[in-house]
Amino acid sequence: MNPLLNTLQPYPFAKLRKLLEGAKLPEDLKPISLSIGEPKHPAPDTVKQALFDHQALFEKYPPTGGYPELKEAIGNWIEKRYGVKLDPASQILPTNGSREALFALTQVLIDPTQDPVVVMPNPFYQIYEGAAKLAGAQPYFCPMTAETGFKPNYSSIPEDVLKRTQLLFVCSPNNPTGTVLSLEDWRK
């Protein structure tokens, strides 16, 4: 067993679900749950029908790199939305969600033989820390406080940490604060 597993924190959503277990909601109010970012609405009927119509695709494993048609559709959407042309064959890799992609990316990029650091905002999306630790890197937390406008202050990172940094996580809008970095923030 990988001994680095012992360094991981409990996943916060499991903890949150346990805290919310048995909570009584006021009967006269219809609260909106902002606790866990999971779908709150059923899939549209058109999506359900498309899945039904193409259920034969689910009878075998998909291609490792994703279906070419899906990758091309993603590339077309990115080009239309952002004006960026990507090569679907070499620059687009569908995943089952952001956690899978962020974890895999971290494992690929980190060289644990070089005393690596992964810089991440704090508060942060839990997978950043777990992926860094399991890749053999030391997490370095950039605090986001009222004083920094709830934005990470990367200029406060010590030089020795920067020299060892192999990966920097940036999320805008930030999860969980919702803070959006301006173009000027990105330039810093």
Label every PLM stretch briefly.
Residues 1-3:
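Extreme N-terminal starter segment of soluble prokaryotic enzymes
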Residues 6-97:
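N-terminal small-domain helix-loop-helix segment of the aminotransferase-like
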Residues 58-188:
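Conserved core of the PLP fold type I
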